[in-house]
From Swiss-Prot:
Protein name: RNA-directed RNA polymerase L
Start and end residues of each RdRp catalytic domain: 628-811
Active site: H1263 (nucleophile), K1673 (for mrna (nucleoside-2'-o-)-methyltransferase activity), D1779 (for mrna (nucleoside-2'-o-)-methyltransferase activity), K1817 (for mrna (nucleoside-2'-o-)-methyltransferase activity), E1848 (for mrna (nucleoside-2'-o-)-methyltransferase activity)
Family stated for the protein in its record: Belongs to the paramyxovirus L protein family.
Organism: Human metapneumovirus (strain CAN97-83) (HMPV)
GO cellular component: host cell cytoplasm; virion component
Complexes and interactors: Interacts with the phosphoprotein (via C-terminus); the association of P and L forms the polymerase complex.
Length: 2005
């Protein structure tokens, strides 16, 4: 924008630089200039265009005057001509169309034959191809007319483009039929001689018309082809069956309607979508769902209709068009009715059709958009008064805050820091302390209001330096306010402004004049990386005078007031910063936002979501409630503009607090109202009246101030998060489950809620009721914060998902393939009309017709139709290259004809069109792509393609086929391909040169531009980049073999790959041309280069075929086919110059697998079978059953550390270094290289970084790096197939492959096998009309060639690494300092349990190696005492060591010493000297000698304790002879000198921050230098605390003692008499089975009586016991009293005991016996004899209670348990009693076997021979089970107190000849017998204390006796909702919600009342059954109470029944 040269300033940018938008103002300007009267609207544009038109319009005017007479023609607007232009069939191109189609069929035949050959589908004898269903002779007119129309208009445009290339700014005049066109790039005219009308429009309008014709042709062509195929064989064509005649009628009706209604008519077209939506709802939903929506919609349409005429008349007032007549309301209404009828007929009740039509509306053209109008609409929206509800806003803020808290807890295991904790209630403070949050169910609105008051402290920070990621945002920006006039053509501005503007630009810096963010930085010579932060911190952006918001037309929907706003670069960077901070720090807490997902992710998410909500999967919940579900899709009107400061700030403030900023996140709301909003569209200048400062210009259309709302696209992320929080609130209020996906205002919400169905409420009604209720709630919620739901675009459905325009119903996604191919045509998506890119676009777009099991044939026909057109027709006259392309193509074809010796020219073309582009053919879609889409290796695939192609070409000789591959292999080496090209894709044969050339062009262009950049950062980096890029190759130049991916990895691990990003970004086609020249024109040199590139590409095949070296050997398989894999490898290795390159080949499934349709499963292959039984599965889509297939990334283990701390760059750098280590593993010198790279980029040594690096696990580097893995696009559409080999590890083929390749990563070969198999199923079904039931893919071993990983030789050249890393500028990642490293390596204790990957060595103190942890902690503890003592002496008044004496007895003294030494060094070595010196170590040890002797006295006192002494003796026997503390001191110091260093546990506080910072720094230095130490952390405040926790964590006690113990524990003095205690136990009833039938066919239960009971009545007589009550069920004296008498044991061993109740009973029965007690130290159960202590009163009779044992040693299934069983008691295990609950039978047997092993090997037990018994609990199984060898069962006891339905029994086992265990049947049988014949005994005495404890734990405050009065009192308590009782204990579990409490409590009270009122009866099952049957609310009782609670309830019930009079 150089102001001195007027011509460059005033570049005419036509509206075509805005994609797809047709500018109203420009059209108006053109017309007004030509007519000298306002054209479309009388506004300022018309005025300036008449007075001072731009020079281009004047030229156009002159041309018109000379070439066309328009004076007597009627002037109309462009849309009025649309109907006539579309119907203007000038010449019929039917013959051309037939030619293209015929050729397309021939070319497709070859491809089809290839498919059939590979799939082994033989054609039948009459040999008619399916392609013959497409009859070229009968192409309907509704296809051919569109082709002719498009062809003619396209010809005109191409002719114009050719002219323009020769002479810029040329004007072309041509007539087409009855129309005459004048075309120029800055305005066009059409004149109709038929209707005597004339119209003016922009070049874009013409292009749009051309595209519309093309789209209509493509749509109709697909419809016709598909229907012809489907008529003859169902399933060949597409799934939709639209009617071409009708689509044609639809186009015509709409065109006619638009031609009458002018531009305003498009507002009707916009409503069609809604109409189709209502049709879709009518198909998928029940009437009540769709009617409402339909009515709203039709009302909307008629509303629009009534407004049309007024709108139009208002606009054309006092213009040329004023007198044109406007149609009557009735006329338009009739046309509208026709259109809708047409749509309805087209849809024909078929969802596929509806989905397809939903998109077809791009086929009617685009409206012209009036920018000023759109802007006025924005202005109006923002002036609306909003009424906001404060409470709603507060709830919204609370929900937002809760999300952040949840996010912190989930990610960082803590809450964010809070300033004002006191605003929280007790309950929330509890969560805060517990570092947790409540579940959704526990929340209420009140909580949100409470949380809203929280204020956070800063958790994240604004980056210090401007980050490259920000600079690389290539966004558009506006000129600053004083230069805003640069936007408009200078002619349009008054003189005064022009002059002042010249002055201003002259003084302005370059960076202010640009319109892109990137250039704003590039051209800034004062750029300072730290500036942005100070700009933010000082908040200058809030008062910046240069701020301006300019709105331009960018969106298609401008008509409804969506504007695209731009602001100057300085402010734009603030916004980029805010967005980036949100995206990095806060968006992760809101997973529902779709802003962060790519397309494939989205597709997967949608598939999962629709699968979940599908009607077919609706279920009832466990309480048999129907789960009502509905889905709501909302669209909010003017979502962005409805946000005001008030609504944004409530959440923005929270974000500000977290980032420590002020108003950074809603700054726009603070500043925009003070700013002028101006319409910055070129042809819409404001009326200035000569005023330069736009703040002083009066408001007018297109310029206003005081903009209140948000601006489209500016705070999207924040607003989306607010919307999510709002839905959180709604969900809590309605107690509904909501799943939502949101993207700004477009929300898809699923709601579900259980309901009870009743008479009038069926499932549909329940769903509907829920949907309406929720919609109302959502609407109200939005209304309260000032938003309005759009009626026409908000709908509810039971099962229809619709988001970002993808329709899914019943869990099935409806692909809309036609939509995707509307745009296919020649020269698409190219700037320089490159033939190769264009062909690739055609290929990939047409493939959309194949994916998801659509039609492969339609895809082939359409693709080849356009490719043939492109190559054989369009290339004859290329706008840039003239005839050169066609000549080159002819040469190539001739060489093909000669080489393959083909007679007919057509066959040559067919063949060439099927040779893949990689070899210079014409086929952009390699064969494999129709079957699987992730390719490991293009080259192999291309070779396989050619192999199959030549196989089916019958007219080519075999020798020729082989010689083709020889020619391929004899391709000459490429001299110019160096490392640079390796950086790109080394896959295709011709690509090296191309890659080299393009990358050269880009690099030179960009680096030269960058190096001239005034911005120091960029210029330095450009020079650095160009200098160093080649040198990277040198680093690894001596390493062989050369390995492209390795080089790539090396390249990326050197930090300047960020520089490459800049280069690539700038060299992207668009921006490079913009940089090279100011306009979007392209210069001659570019054109020449592009043309020569195209010629090179087209000539590749003839170059390949020109040389054939006959001596080359071609590898051939036994069956005569080639081995493609090897050819590919050889080719790749030989086509590079002087490098031994490792071939990264990977087999192609198309050649390495044979497809066999067989049902025998013994075939060694991969089996894929169909899941459904239908003959075909077309149409019913979606896997409803297991779907197999996954897209795998390389597996890597990421070490566990706190990743939050690192920046994104640091994480990327670590990843790159990890990859580097992985690839070059084992290469000499690798460590040094890595060390240099680490120091250069991260600033710390490799050694320290090592624990942070990810570790890759795959064996085969080669493939893992080269397999690019993309998920298949299949899942939701193909019918469900499954594969029997979920993994190939088990498949028989695996054997064969493993034998051949060793244990290599074979799965790689099969990466694609499954998705391929599924596609095959689908394709076979299309081609044959039936679906194979099963197919097997059999690998051919010769073809599978897995490379071993390369063994690298040679050394790295380090010298350059220093140079490259020291040259770093903006690109180097941040350095990591040692302290951060320390923080990162600290997994908190909590994190460990969950992480399954946690390597045992990663964190040394993980609590499982107790001895080591203990020793280390003790050593640290003593060191702590030492350092404390050095600081202050008085600490030793109390003996510190004593508390831990017993712990010292278990330590490992060696570790103790090592840790002591290391810790000492860290505490004392902090004098700042270098740690390396040995002296420092000695110094700190010498210092010990001088330490006060009080310490040594104390220390030695502990160490000389007898048990500790024994332990130390193991380390050094000399210890025995030491006397006195002096001797100890000398000995200890001597030992210390020789000790090694060792890792230390460090202490952190509750926040997770380190406590001893100084020492830690030294420790980190130690790590860096020598040791292989790891950092470990314990989160406690001091070592003594940590120590106790460590040990107690292993012991039991901490959770059992929390339960309130109501027992006589307090007065332990009175010794309780055991025999009297026995009366509290009830008498026991049992049956003893001695000999029993063990056959498994034992009929189940011979008794007919079967009790139907729901409650655990076996607890009825156990009311005297609280914690456990096994003793009420089983008794030693009653069961095996005789045995006890015989053996007379002194000690009984109870293992697997819980709270020790059985032991207590035994203690009462045998007062003299002592006990050994073992219980599994599991957190879930008691591991302390609590009940025993309660009953007996003290523990003196338990001689070994398992104190101090770890978890393994208390687990009876572990050997260590039995080894330590005699650690105290030296008595034999005469009788061992086991009451353990084992997970499964195996564990029971483990225990038995270990018991047997023990008693047969232990020297104490063996003295008793075989007279040892095990009395154990066992759950019988159905089958016959043998006991382990040499263990026999003597008797089985069935207890009355066991669960009735279970199969629990107690067996007495001894040593002897093994026999069988009883089976389920007999146990059941004798259980029933006992149940029928016996009553339960009640205990003789009642223990009131226990009963009271039971009552209280059941219902707090329940007292005994339980009578009517007591229950009434309880009821009264319930109704008084007092605060303090809201937290109470019910059955031992805390319950917070008072509602639940009342629910549970009232349930309990009801039951107790029922018991109170029932009669007294005998305690037997008949009576219990009667009790249950007479109680009406059984189900409620069982649903509301947990297991434990029910047991308590039965105990209390038993007490009530017993105490009845």
């Amino acid at each position: 924008m150089d102001p001195l040269n007027e011509s460059t300033v005033n570049v005419y940018l036509p509206d075509s630089y805005l994609k797809g938008v047709i500018s109203f103002s420009e059209t108006n300007a053109i017309g007004s200039c030509l007519l000298k009267r306002p054209y479309l609207k009388n506004d300022n544009t018309a005025k300036v265009a008449i007075e001072n038109p731009v020079i281009e319009h004047v030229r156009l005017k002159n041309a018109v005057n000379s070439k066309m007479k328009i004076s007597d023609y009627k002037v109309v607007e462009p849309v009025n001509m649309q109907h006539e232009i579309m119907k203007n069939v000038h010449s019929c191109e039917l013959t051309l169309l037939k030619q293209f189609l015929t050729r397309s069929k021939n070319i497709s035949t070859l491809k089809l034959n290839m498919i059939c050959d590979w799939l082994q589908l033989k054609s039948t004898s009459d040999d008619t191809s399916i392609l013959s269903f497409i009859d070229v002779e009968f192409i309907p007119s509704w296809v051919s007319n569109w082709f002719s129309n498009w062809y003619n208009l396209n010809k005109l445009i191409l002719e114009f483009r050719r002219e323009e290339v020769i002479r810029t700014g040329s004007i072309l005049c041509r007539s087409l039929g009855k129309l005459v066109f004048i075309v120029s790039s800055y305005g066009c005219i059409v004149k109709s001689n038929k209707s005597k009308r004339v119209s003016f429009f922009t070049y874009n309008q013409l292009l749009t018309w051309k595209d519309v014709m093309l789209s209509r042709f493509n749509a109709n062509f697909c419809i016709w082809v598909s229907n012809s195929l489907n008529e003859n064989q169902e399933g060949l064509g597409l799934r939709s069956n639209l009617q071409g005649m009708l689509t044609n009628k639809l186009y015509e009706t709409v065109d006619y309607m638009l031609s009458l209604c002018c531009n305003e008519g498009f507002s009707l077209v916009k409503e069609f979508e809604g109409f189709i939506m209502s049709e879709i709802l009518r198909i998928t939903e029940h009437a009540q769902f769709s009617t409402r929506f339909r009515n709203t919609l039709l009302n909307g349409l008629t509303d629009q209709l009534t407004k049309l005429k007024n709108k139009n008349r208002l606009r054309v007032h006092s213009t040329v068009l004023e007198n044109n007549d406007y149609p009557m309301y009735e006329v338009v209404l009739k046309l509208l009715g026709d259109t809708l009828r047409c749509i309805k007929l087209l849809i024909n009740k078929n969802l596929e059709n509806a989905a397809e039509l939903y998109y077809i509306f791009r086929i009617f053209g685009h409206p012209m958009v009036d920018e000023r109008d759109a802007m006025d609409a924005v202005k109006l929206n923002n002036e609306i008064t909003k009424i906001l509800r404060l409470e709603s806003l507060t709830e919204l803020r609370g929900a937002f805050i809760l999300r952040i808290i949840k996010g912190f807890v989930d990610n960082n295991k803590r809450w964010p820091k809070i300033k004002n904790l006191k605003v929280l209630s007790k309950r929330w403070t509890m969560y805060f302390k517990a570092k947790n949050y409540p579940s959704q169910l526990e929340l209420s609105e009140q909580d949100f209001l409470e949380l809203a008051a929280i204020q956070f402290e800063q958790e994240f920070s604004v980056p210090e330096k401007t980050n490259l990621e920000m600079v690389l945002n290539d966004k558009a920006i506006s000129p600053p306010k004083r230069l805003i006039w640069s936007v408009y053509p200078k002619n349009y501005l008054p003189e005064t402004i022009k002059n002042r503007y010249l002055e201003e630009t002259f003084n302005a810096s370059d960076s202010l004049k640009t319109r892109r963010v990137l250039e704003y930085y590039l051209k800034d010579n004062k750029f300072d990386q730290k500036e942005l932060k100070s700009y933010v911190v000082r908040q200058e952006y809030l008062n910046d005078k240069e701020h301006i918001v300019s709105l331009t037309g960018k969106e298609r929907e401008l008509s409804v007031g969506r504007m695209f706003a731009m602001q100057p670069g300085k402010q734009r960077q603030i916004q980029i910063l805010a967005e980036k901070l949100l995206a990095d720090n806060i968006v992760p807490f809101f997973p529902e936002t779709l802003t962060k997902y790519g397309d494939l992710d989205l597709q997967r998410i949608m598939e999962i979501k629709s699968e979940l909500s599908s009607i077919k999967t609706r279920r009832n919940d466990s309480y048999n409630n129907y789960i009502a579900r509905a889905s709501i899709v909302t669209d909010l009107s003017k979502f962005n503009q409805a946000f005001r400061y008030e609504t944004t700030a409530i959440c923005a403030d929270v974000a500000d607090e977290l980032h420590g900023t002020q108003s950074l996140f809603c700054w726009l709301h603070l500043i925009v109202p003070m700013t002028t909003m101006i319409c910055a569209y070129r042809h819409a200048p404001p009326e200035t009246k000569g005023e330069y400062d736009i703040d002083k210009i009066e408001e007018q259309s297109g310029l206003y101030r005081y903009h209140m709302g948000g601006i489209e696209g500016w705070c999207q992320k924040l607003w989306t998060m607010e919307a999510i929080s709002l839905l959180d609130v709604v969900s809590v209020k309605t107690r509904c489950q909501m799943t939502s996906l949101l993207n700004g205002d477009n929300q898809s919400i699923d709601v579900s809620k259980p309901v009870k169905l009743s008479e009038g409420l069926d499932e549909v009604k329940a769903d509907y009721r829920l949907a309406v209720k929720m919609l109302k709630e959502i609407r109200d919620a939005y209304r309260n914060i000032g938003h309005k739901l759009k009626e026409g675009e908000t709908y509810i459905s039971r099962d229809l998902q619709f988001i970002s325009k993808v329709i899914q119903s019943e869990g099935v996604m409806h692909p809309t393939p036609i939509k995707k191919v509307l745009r296919v045509g020649p020269w698409i998506n190219t700037i320089l009309d490159d033939i190769k890119t264009s062909a690739e676009s055609i290929g990939s777009l047409c493939q959309e017709l194949e994916f998801r099991g659509e039609s492969i044939i339609v895809s082939l026909i359409l693709r080849n139709f356009w490719l043939y057109n492109l190559y054989m027709h369009e290339s004859k006259q290329h706008p840039l290259a003239g005839k050169q392309l066609f000549k080159q193509l002819n040469k190539t074809l001739t060489s093909v004809q000669r080489f393959f010796e083909i007679k007919r020219e057509n066959e040559v073309v067919d063949l060439w069109m099927n040779i893949p582009m990689q070899f210079g053919g014409g086929d952009p879609v390699v064969f494999y792509r129709s079957f699987y889409r992730r390719t490991p290796d293009f080259l192999t695939e291309a070779i396989s393609h050619v192999d199959i192609l030549l196989k089916i070409s019958a007219n080519i000789k075999n020798e020729t086929k082989v010689s083709f591959f020889k020619a391929l292999l004899s391709i000459e080496k490429n001299e110019r391909a160096t490392l640079t090209t390796l950086m790109r894709d080394p896959q295709a044969v011709g690509s090296e040169r191309q890659a080299k050339v393009t990358s050269d062009i880009n690099r030179t262009a960009v680096t030269s531009i960058l190096s001239l950049s005034p911005n120091q950062l960029f210029s330095d980096s450009a020079i650095h980049y160009s200098r160093n890029e080649e040198e990277v190759g040198i680093i690894a130049e001596n390493i062989t073999p050369v390995y492209p991916h390795g080089l790539r990895v090396l390249y990326e691990s050197l930090p300047f790959h960020k520089a490459e990003k800049v280069v690539n970004m700038i060299s992207g086609t668009k921006s490079i041309t913009n940089l090279l020249q100011r306009t979007s024109a392209i210069n001659g040199e570019d054109i020449d280069r592009a043309v020569s590139m195209m010629l090179e590409n087209l000539g590749l095949l003839s170059r390949i075929l020109s040389v054939v070296v006959d001596s080359i050997e071609i590898p051939i398989k036994s069956n005569g086919r080639l081995i493609c894999c090897q050819i590919s490898r050889t080719l790749r290795e030989t086509s590079w110059n002087n490098m031994e390159i490792v071939g990264v080949t990977s087999p192609s499934i198309t050649t390495c697998m044979d497809v066999i349709y067989a049902t025998s499963s013994h075939l060694k292959g991969i089996i894929i079978e169909k899941f459904s039984t239908d003959r075909t599965t077309r149409g019913q889509r979606g896997p409803k059953s297991p779907w197999v297939g996954s897209s795998t990334q390389e597996k890597k283990l990421v070490p566990v550390y706190n990743r939050q701390i690192l920046s994104k760059q640091q994480r990327e750098q670590l990843e790159a270094i990890g990859k580097m280590r992985w690839v070059y593993k084992g290469t000499p010198g690798l460590r040094r290289l890595l060390n240099k790279i680490c120091l250069g980029s991260l600033g710390i040594s490799y050694k320290c970084v090592k624990p942070l690096l990810p570790r890759f696990m795959s064996v085969n580097f080669l493939h893992r790096l080269s397999v690019s893995s993309r998920p298949m696009e299949f899942p939701a559409s193909v019918p469900a197939y499954r594969t029997t080999n979920y993994h190939f590890d088990t498949s028989p083929i695996n054997q064969a492959l493993s034998e051949r390749f060793g244990n290599e990563d074979i799965n790689l070969v099969f990466q694609n096998a499954i998705s391929c198999g599924i596609s095959i199923m689908s394709v076979v079904e299309q081609l044959t009309g039936r679906s194979p039931k099963q197919l097997v893919l059999i690998p051919q071993l010769e073809e599978i060639d897995i490379m071993p990983p390369p063994v690298f030789q040679g050394k790295f050249n380090y010298k350059l690494v220093d140079k490259i890393t020291s040259d770093q500028h903006i690109f180097s990642p941040d350095k990591i300092d040692m302290l951060t490293l320390g923080k990162m390596l600290m997994p908190t204790i909590k994190g460990q349990k969950t992480d399954q990957f946690l390597n045992k060595r990663e964190n040394y103190f993980h609590g499982n190696n107790l001895i080591e942890s203990l020793s280390a902690a003790l050593a640290c503890h003593w060191c702590g005492i030492l350092t404390e003592q050095c600081i202050e002496n008085n600490i030793f008044k109390k003996d510190w060591g004593d508390g831990f004496i017993s712990d010292h007895a278990f330590m490992d003294f060696k570790i103790f010493l090592c840790v002591f030494k290391t810790k000492l060094l860290c505490s004392w070595g902090s004098q700042g000297k270098n740690i390396k010196d040995e002296d420092i170590v000695d110094e700190s040890i010498d210092k010990l000698l001088r330490i006060d002797n009080t310490f040594w006295r104390m220390f030695s006192k502990v160490m000389f304790e007898p048990k500790v002494k024994k332990r130390i003796m193991l380390y050094d026997v000399k210890f025995l002879s030491l006397v006195g503390y002096i001797g100890f001191k000398n000995w200890f110091i001597e030992q210390l000198r020789s000790a090694e260093l060792h890792e230390i546990p460090w202490i952190v506080n509750a926040e997770g921050d380190l406590v001893e910072i100084k020492s830690i720094k030294i420790y980190l230095q130690l790590i860096e230098q020598s040791l292989f130490l790891r950092i470990t952390v314990l989160n406690y405040t001091d070592m003594a605390h940590a120590l106790t926790r460590l040990i107690r964590k292993k012991l039991m006690c901490d959770n059992a003692l929390l339960t309130p113990i109501s027992s006589p524990m307090v007065n332990l003095t009175q010794v309780i008499d055991p025999t009297t205690q026995l009366d509290y136990f009830p008498k026991i009833t049992f049956e003893r089975l001695k000999n029993y039938d063990t056959s498994s066919n034992y009929a189940k239960g011979k008794l007919t009586r079967n009790y139907m009971i729901l409650l655990p009545w076996q607890h009825v007589n156990r009311y005297n016991f609280v914690f456990s009550s096994t003793g009420c069920k089983v008794s030693l004296k009653t069961c095996i009293g005789k045995l006890m008498k015989d053996l007379n044991p002194k000690v009984l061993y109870f293992i697997g005991e819980g709270a020790g109740n059985w032991m207590a009973r035994t203690a009462c029965e045998y007062p003299d016996i002592k006990f050994v007690y073992r219980s599994l130290k599991d957190d879930l159960d008691h591991h302390y004899p609590l009940e025993y202590q309660r009953v007996i009163g003290e523990l003196s009779r338990i001689i070994d209670s398992g104190e101090g044992l770890s978890m393994e040693t208390t687990d009876a299934t572990q050997k260590t348990h039995w080894d330590l069983i005699h650690r105290v008691s030296k008595d034999a295990l005469l009788i061992t009693l086991c009451d353990a609950e084992f997970k499964d039978r195996d564990d029971f047997f483990k225990m038995v076997i270990l018991w047997r092993k023990h008693v047969l090997s232990c020297r104490i037990c063996t003295t008793y021979g075989t007279d040892l018994y095990l009395f154990a609990k066992y759950h019988a199984k159905d089958c016959n089970v043998k006991l382990p060898f040499f263990v026999r069962s003597v008797a089985t006891f069935i207890m009355q107190g066991s669960k009735l339905s279970g199969s629990e029994c107690y067996i007495l086992l001894t040593l002897g000849h093994h026999n069988s265990l009883p089976c389920h049947g007999e146990i059941q049988n004798s259980k029933m017998k006992i149940a029928v014949c016996n009553d339960f005994y009640a205990a003789k005495k009642l223990d009131n204390k226990s009963i009271e404890a039971n009552c209280k734990s059941l219902l707090s405050g329940l007292r005994i006796p339980i009578n009517k009065k007591e229950l009434d009192r309880q009821r009264r308590l319930l109704t008084l909702q007092s605060n303090h009782s809201s937290v109470a204990t019910v059955g031992g579990s805390k319950i917070i919600e008072s509602k639940w409490l009342t629910n549970k409590a009232s349930t309990i009270i009801d039951w107790l009342e029922h018991i109170l009122n029932s009669p007294k009866g005998e305690l037997n099952y008949d009576f219990f059954e009667a009790l249950e049957n007479t109680y009406p609310n059984m189900i409620k009782l069982i649903d509301n109470l947990g297991n434990a609670e029910i047991k308590k309830l039965i105990k209390v019930t038993g007490y009530m029944l017993v105490s009845k009079k």
